[in-house]
Curated annotation (Swiss-Prot):
Protein name as annotated: Adenosylhomocysteinase
The entry's keywords: Hydrolase, NAD, One-carbon metabolism
Cofactor stoichiometry and binding remark: Binds 1 NAD(+) per subunit.
Function: Adenosylhomocysteine is a competitive inhibitor of S-adenosyl-L-methionine-dependent methyl transferase reactions; therefore adenosylhomocysteinase may play a key role in the control of methylations via regulation of the intracellular concentration of adenosylhomocysteine.
Binding site for substrate: 63, 147, 209, 239, 243
Keyword Cell inner membrane set for record: no
Enzyme class: hydrolase
Cofactor: NAD(+)
Organism: Trichomonas vaginalis
Origin organism lineage: Eukaryota, Metamonada, Parabasalia, Trichomonadida, Trichomonadidae
Chain residues that bind NAD(+): 210-212, 244, 273-278, 296, 331, 352-354, 400
Amino acid sequence: MACKSPAGAPFEYRIADINLHVLGRKELTLAEKEMPGLMVLRERYSASKPLKGVRISGSLHMTVQTAVLIETLTALGADVRWASCNIFSTQDTAAAAIVVGPTGTPEKPAGIPVFAWKGETLPEYWENTYRALTWPDGQGPQQVVDDGGDATLLISKGFEFETAGAVPEPTEADNLEYRCVLATLKQVFNQDKNHWHTVAAGMNGVSEETTTGVHRLYQLEKEGKLLFPAINVNDAVTKSKFDNIYGCRHSLIDGINRASDVMIGGKTALVMGYGDVGKGCAQSLRGQGARVIITEVDPICALQAVMEGYQVRRIEEVVKDVDIFVTCTGNCDIISVDMMAQMKDKAIVGNIGHFDNEIDTDGLMKYPGIKHIPIKPEYDMWEFPDGHAILLLAEGRLLNLGCATGHPSFVMSMSFTNQTLAQLDLYEKRGNLEMKVYTLPKHLDEEVVRLHLGSLDVHLTKLTQKQADYINVPVEGPYKSDAYRY
């Protein structure tokens, strides 16, 4: 249940407990030490404030690391409002610290409006997303920091239904989440039938954090429905090859261990999907001594897995033998309820893809005779009529954020440095970008890495002019073509 801002507060907020701000500020201060890229950007731009007055909405996990990103954007002058992009991923200490701010108190907060707490319901989640997109005077954002595309979805669907002249009845939706989306949009439509058209017209663009959200953006572009320019942060090398691999390598195990407290060594683990996230997950499980099997549809990724020493099988072939299941495909219907009915007793089932549709949790809840036995928050046992049970992590949502605290600060510093650079780019080029999805240029990728090497005591070799001429690159880079695959 959220704590709402009291009457007379300097701004609106909805968080779990504002009195958690002291611990949150301590966590934030420690995280800053591990996030050199963001701290350099603060030092570089805080005097000139290139984002002064720019309204930025965030829909991204409200963690300690995100708190450092938020305070970087505000240091650059932005007017920020924030919601989480997952009902379980908020760290309530971080949310409180951001509301209170570095110089405020619970009685007189001096931070920014946050609408997020751990354990939101779906109606609360979509209301919070709307609040993060709406300023007190009714204006919308000029720019969005998105993770998974929910903020972009709300604007795009709102625009679509305003154009059609009506919002479909929520009862027509085939799942609970979309019913909540429609209910939120219907409420807005009844108040202002042109709201989302006004918001879209004022948008400079969006920067998208994750694979699933990027897929949504490219689909909108393909259909001619992209309402504003977008920057694909996910496919920056310094995001996908670090956050997705090494972040998941760290946080997957953290989530499984905190929830289950079982010995992973010696057990059989099935990683479903061998993209960048799957690669990190497979490394982490093997590092704990698990016997790792991969499922894949892509022959290239499958061969990569085999060359790393993993077996590649179909789930149907191994479902009865696996102890730990991890989905990380970014797709839907990966583990069906019929598959869960065949799993061994007390098999652990979790997801580290962005949305909760990789595991058929709806089908699980509706299975005839199923018993739900909560173990602890975000860790539930589901017992089938035959007596065997599975252990579900975070209700099929992101287990690393639902059961733990997500990726560590250092790797998120690279992702969020990219996000900050993308926000600067959107504002600098406002009005000059097409309605398409852009990627960050290679020289910025390399610059992001350079900002982080010093803290790891890395000493780069420097090309001579002769060497640079020989391979036809500048002495200071960039060193690889856009087609190069790291």
